[in-house]
UniProtKB/Swiss-Prot annotation:
<keyword id="KW-0862">Zinc</keyword>
<protein>
    <recommendedName>
        <fullName>[LysW]-lysine hydrolase</fullName>
        <ecNumber>3.5.1.130</ecNumber>
    </recommendedName>
</protein>
<comment type="pathway">
    <text>Amino-acid biosynthesis; L-lysine biosynthesis via AAA pathway; L-lysine from L-alpha-aminoadipate (Thermus route): step 5/5.</text>
</comment>
<comment type="function">
    <text>Catalyzes the release of L-lysine from [LysW]-gamma-L-lysine. In vitro, can deacetylate both N(2)-acetyl-L-lysine and N(2)-acetyl-L-ornithine.</text>
</comment>
<feature type="active site" description="Proton acceptor">
    <location>
        <position position="124"/>
    </location>
</feature>
<dbReference type="GO" id="GO:0050897">
    <property type="term" value="F:cobalt ion binding"/>
</dbReference>
<feature type="binding site">
    <location>
        <position position="125"/>
    </location>
    <ligand>
        <name>Zn(2+) 2</name>
    </ligand>
</feature>
<dbReference type="InterPro" id="IPR050072">
    <property type="entry name" value="Peptidase_M20A"/>
</dbReference>
<keyword id="KW-0378">Hydrolase</keyword>
<dbReference type="Pfam" id="PF01546">
    <property type="entry name" value="Peptidase_M20"/>
</dbReference>
<feature type="binding site">
    <location>
        <position position="148"/>
    </location>
    <ligand>
        <name>Zn(2+) 1</name>
    </ligand>
</feature>
<comment type="similarity">
    <text>Belongs to the peptidase M20A family. LysK subfamily.</text>
</comment>
<comment type="subunit">
    <text>Homotetramer and homooctamer.</text>
</comment>
<keyword id="KW-0457">Lysine biosynthesis</keyword>
<keyword id="KW-0170">Cobalt</keyword>
<dbReference type="InterPro" id="IPR002933">
    <property type="entry name" value="Peptidase_M20"/>
</dbReference>
<feature type="binding site">
    <location>
        <position position="91"/>
    </location>
    <ligand>
        <name>Zn(2+) 1</name>
    </ligand>
</feature>
Length: 361
């Protein structure tokens, strides 16, 4: 059991008080690693600035990975009316700290059957996903849990994929009286065509199976002799439309005069409902007094990055309401956070029982 009586709420509060926008996670990683050491875990910071921990010496390898970077924009950290406010309370320092305390509370029997690897990953909120990509080839789990808010009774089975697109049109400048579309108008026409294609793809589909599109930026660069227009948009992709297939469609709709660049290429993922891991979570949620609910998310997470590398049972789980992600009033209910720790610990104990009697090798 844990060597220190660290209070989980106060420990999370301390993590929230350390700003950690993507690319600047080192200080919070050191704080979390030190806390893991105080709780009796092996704790350290790796070369990607991930906060890492390990407990147990069993043959069954379990990865608990949540991200410790946040979007920009600090929120005054405060405990108010049973709610803990702060950037990252939900997305996703809260879920990762819950993972730390769940692992620290494991029984000796569970520690003999499992080796639990904790990863507080960096740059999840950036296109790089630096932390997840660093550990992907270095860890070989039998099970993986991604720390993202699902609500303490929720089990997330999948996330949509994502494709980032830059479109550019450059052409000779001409007088506005000419009956010819300018560079900006050509890009607008292209985006309208993409919207029409996506809407046709979405007919009769539930939200998780729809293609979502968002125009992120549109720029027109003034020039005397050449017109230059650029736009940036992203697509959220359902499992039936992997990034390379989406690129084929986007390229087909683009006139040859429009230059396209593609980034991200996160593969959509949806895991099965019935695995030893989902059964362990369902059991733990019921034991804590809840009713398990499976969820599919229209966003993306490190699950999209890791699923192609780790073909093992994988879910996302964490306390918190995901509708509060990135908002100026992000907070987690303290009772919800503590329930999340209870469920995570219970799921690990149940998983250990599933593998009772197994030997190394």
């Amino acid at each position: 059991m844990s060597k220190s009586a660290l209070d989980p709420v106060e420990f999370l509060k301390g993590a929230l008080e350390i700003p950690s926008p993507s690319g600047k996670e080192r200080l919070v990683a050191e704080y979390l690693a030190e806390g893991m050491q105080k709780l009796g875990l092996k704790g350290f910071v790796d070369e990607a600035d991930n906060a890492r921990g390990q407990v147990g010496e069993g043959p069954v390898q379990v990865v608990l990975l949540g991200h410790i970077d946040t979007v920009p924009g600090q929120i005054p950290v405060r405990l108010e009316g049973g709610r803990l406010f702060g950037r990252g309370a939900v997305d996703a320092k809260g879920p990762f700290v819950a993972m730390i305390f769940a692992a620290a509370g494991l029984s000796e029997e569970a520690r003999k059957r499992l080796t639990v690897h904790l990863v507080g990953a960096t740059e999840e909120e950036a296109p790089s996903s630096k932390g997840a990509r660093f550990v992907a080839p270095r860890l070989k789990p039998h099970y993986a849990v991604i720390g993202e808010p699902s609500g303490w009774e929720g089990i997330t089975l999948g996330y949509k994929g994502r494709l980032l697109v830059k479109a550019r049109r450059e052409k000779d400048h001409f007088h506005s009286a000419h009956h010819e579309p300018n560079a900006a108008e050509e890009l607008i026409s292209y985006f309208v065509a993409i919207k029409a294609w996506a809407e046709a793809m979405n007919v009769g589909q539930r939200p998780f199976d729809q293609v979502q599109y968002t125009l992120r930026d549109f720029r027109v660069h003034p020039a005397e002799l050449r017109q230059v227009a650029e736009m940036f948009f992203d697509l959220r992709l359902p499992p039936r439309l992997p990034p390379e297939e989406a690129i084929r469609h986007l390229t087909a709709y683009a006139p040859p005069t429009i230059e396209l660049e593609f980034f991200g290429r996160e593969v959509p993922y949806q895991g099965p409902k019935d695995t030893p891991l989902t059964r362990a979570f369902r059991q733990a949620i019921r034991k804590a007094g809840g009713r398990p609910v499976f969820k599919l998310k229209t966003g993306t997470s490190d699950m999209n990055v890791l699923a192609p590398h780790w073909p093992v049972p994988m879910v996302a789980y964490g306390p918190g309401d995901s509708t509060l992600d990135h908002t100026p009033y992000e907070h987690v209910e303290v009772a919800e956070f503590l329930k999340g720790i209870e469920v995570l610990r219970g799921a690990l104990e149940a998983l250990a029982q599933t593998h009772a009697g197994e030997k190394e090798g």
